[in-house]
C-alpha cells in the first residue's frame, strides 16, 4: 500500500504530503472493509442455501427430499459461529451494502459449490464436527473465492480501492478461518486492521521518510547502482528501492 501511494504521490504531481498520507490510511481502511465483506460472503452463501430450502418446502407438492433436506451445509458450526461474531456484527451494522444487493452472483457461486466434489463429499460424510465444518469452508474459499475473476470484477465495480487488494486480503480470510476456535463463540477475535498503535505509526513513518528523504535515498541508489542507467529503470522499481 505504501509503495502504491508513494508512486501515486509522484505521478499526480500535487506533492501534498498530508493529503497523500490521508489517502494511505483511507486505502488501508478500505482493504479492511474488504476483509470483513469477504467474511460476510460465506454467511450470505449459507443464507441463500437456507432460502432455497425454505422455497422448496413451500411448494404446493414438495417431494420428500424437499420436505426433509440434508441440513448439514446450512447448520455448519463454523458459519453459525461466524454469523454471531461481535466484531463482524459491528461492521455489518454500519454498512449500507450487503451481499443481498448481489444475489445473482451469490446464486451462481452457490450453484458452482453444490456441483463440486468438495460439497458432495461433505454432505455425504457421516462426520459431524466443528473441525470438519471449518475445513469445508477453508476448502470452499480457496477453491471458489480465492481466484474468482467474476468476483474480482464485481468488487472492483463497488470500489476502485479493492482492485489490487483482494489477493492479499484473501490470505487474511484464510488465516482467519484457520484461527477460529469453537470455544471462543461470538468473541472469536478477527484479524485487526493494525497489529497495534506501533504498527500504524510504522506505516506513517515509513511513508513520510520515503518521501521526505527522497533526494538522499536516490543518491544512495545511484551510488550503489553505478552500472545501471537509472533513467532506464522502471519508476516503480525506483520507488520500491526508495
Language-model segments: residues:
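Class I Rossmann-like S-adenosyl-L-methionine
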Residues: 1-242
